[in-house]
Structure formats: structure tokens, C-alpha cells
């Protein structure tokens, strides 16, 4: 039996396996040979989910893994290894995150730097999409929101579109005006890949043709009610239906989505529901336990670093 086939049979019933697992199960073979057989069969027998973490292609249709760590540190990922980044970073805005005697953000917050976008561009595949969930513009954050776009541009991203997330009937009466929106900011790494069906060209050629852009015309807005206080497990938890809608525009089934600031784990939940693979990164122990409880009964979920 050839080594690649042996590795496949050994791990096909497991959700994920590591290089160390492969070494231990084939101790009679040099580590360099084992790595080479896995690399030679990427896309054939194996798929790489993260650096040193793999699964067999037909073990399950999708997988979700949870990494404990800093979401700004992406060095564990190979270049051009991710099909989509969808994230809602805990943005620092000391004024907007307070109202009266209330503090709305109780977790660690920060502001993006150019290095953050440089790393996002490194791990994302050419033409694929970066989706950032951002606050609505106000007098306190407009400069930062502009800076984010500049960082993205300098890192090689192209501004694709912005779609408003209207939070259903919810209205927040804080600040200078009532608020009920956030922004879904979409960038592509270089020219957007061809996901958009070209009806005119398809009719002329008699074949399915696609042009540069998302998988369909983006809506005027995403009108989705936010998660209720009694149901949410994280202060800034996104609705799973919002994440599903976004992912259907920017990914295909079987692709790998990265959420580097997982929070409640909702992006992983949404990805699995619509047959996408997902990698979640979360730094807070409290949130990691919540994600485990949320997805722990899902046979496609595997926390790999604790």
C-alpha cells in the first residue's frame, strides 16, 4: 500500500489530523517523506485547514476548527490559503462605546494597523474577498474608518462595495442621532474573482459564463434583526442569518472561511449550515468555552488548540 493511501485510510474517519498524528502513525517512515506525500496529495486526498492541520477530503463534507490565540497573529497560515475572511473586530472607540453610565464594550478592543491588513492579504487567495463588519460612521470614528480603507488599499485590496446592515426594528437611542445600522465592508484581493453569472455572454455562447464580482448582485441592504439579549452569548454577536447571506455572496461550498475574532463563533455556525469550512480564532477563554458549548454537539466541530 502506498504511503498516501495508508495516510488516507488511517485518518478518513477523523475530522482533522495534524502532522504529528501522521508521524506517530507512520513511525517507520522519515518525517520528510510523510510531509511530502501529504503535500503531493493536497486537493486530491487531503485539504489543509491551517498550518500543520489537515483532513481527508471525503471524511466529512465540511469542518470547523477553533484555534486559541491572537487573531492579529496569522503566521500559522500559509500564503494564499484562505478563500474568505469574514470578521467583526473589537474596534476601539472610547467615546462611542459609552453612553451615560453604561459601557457597551467590556472586552479588549484595539485599532487595526497596516500590518493587520498586510497579513490578511498574505493569507487570502488572489481575487477572494475580505469582509469587515464595521460601525456606522459618526463624529468619533470617521477618521478610523477612512484609515481602514487606506490600510486595505496599501495592502493590495480593492474596495468592492459597502452594504448596510439594517438591524430590523431595533433602534439605539445613544449619541447625536438614533442608530440601527452597521456597515458590511467588502474588499477583494486584487481584481475580484469571477463568481457573478454573465447572463448576456452565456446566452450568446451557449455556455455558462461568469464575470468578475460576487456571486450575484449585492442587495441594497441586509435587513436582519439583531440577536436578542436573552439569546446572545456575546455582546456584539452577529445574527447567523446575516453571516449566511454574506458568505453565500462571497464563497462557494467547500471553501475555507476565516474569522480571526470569533467572539460567539457565529461565523463558524453559519459556515457549517451552508457547507463551508471555517477556521475560528479566539483569544478569550470565556468566549472559547461559549463557542464550544454552541458548536460542541456539531460533529463537524473540532477544537484543536486549548
Descriptions of predicted regions:
Residues 2-288:
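Core catalytic lobe of class I
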Residues 291-292:
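Conserved SAM-binding loop
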Residues 296-306:
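Class I S-adenosyl-L-methionine-dependent methyltransferase module
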Amino acid at each position: 500500500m502506498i504511503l498516501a493511501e495508508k495516510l488516507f485510510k488511517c485518518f478518513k474517519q477523523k475530522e482533522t489530523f495534524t502532522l504529528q498524528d501522521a508521524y506517530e502513525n507512520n513511525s517507520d517512515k522519515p518525517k520528510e517523506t510523510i510531509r511530502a506525500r501529504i503535500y503531493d496529495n493536497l486537493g486530491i486526498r487531503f485539504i489543509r485547514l491551517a498550518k500543520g492541520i489537515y483532513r481527508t477530503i471525503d471524511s466529512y463534507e465540511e469542518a470547523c476548527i477553533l484555534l486559541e490565540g491572537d487573531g492579529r497573529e496569522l503566521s500559522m497560515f500559509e500564503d494564499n490559503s484562505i478563500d474568505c475572511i469574514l470578521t467583526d473586530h473589537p474596534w476601539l472607540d472610547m467615546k462611542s462605546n459609552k453612553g451615560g453610565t453604561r459601557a457597551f464594550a467590556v472586552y479588549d478592543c484595539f485599532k487595526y494597523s497596516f500590518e493587520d491588513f498586510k497579513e490578511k492579504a498574505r493569507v487570502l487567495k488572489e481575487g477572494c474577498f475580505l469582509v469587515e463588519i464595521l460601525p456606522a460612521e459618526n463624529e468619533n470614528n470617521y477618521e478610523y474608518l477612512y484609515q481602514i480603507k487606506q490600510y486595505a488599499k496599501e495592502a493590495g485590496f480593492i474596495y468592492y462595495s459597502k452594504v448596510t446592515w439594517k438591524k430590523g426594528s431595533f433602534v439605539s437611542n445613544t449619541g447625536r442621532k438614533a442608530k440601527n445600522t452597521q456597515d458590511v465592508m467588502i474588499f477583494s484581493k486584487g481584481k475580484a474573482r469571477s463568481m457573478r453569472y454573465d447572463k448576456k455572454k452565456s446566452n450568446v455562447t451557449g455556455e455558462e459564463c461568469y464575470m468578475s464580482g460576487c456571486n450575484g448582485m449585492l442587495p441594497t441592504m441586509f435587513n436582519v434583526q439583531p440577536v436578542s439579549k436573552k439569546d446572545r452569548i456575546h455582546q456584539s454577536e452577529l445574527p447567523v442569518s446575516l453571516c449566511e447571506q454574506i458568505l453565500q455572496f462571497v464563497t462557494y461550498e467547500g471553501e475555507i472561511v476565516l474569522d480571526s475574532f470569533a467572539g460567539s463563533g457565529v461565523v463558524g455556525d453559519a459556515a457549517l449550515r451552508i457547507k463551508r469550512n471555517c477556521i475560528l480564532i479566539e483569544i478569550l477563554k470565556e468566549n472559547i468555552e461559549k463557542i464550544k458549548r454552541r458548536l460542541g454537539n456539531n460533529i463537524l466541530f473540532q477544537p484543536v488548540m486549548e
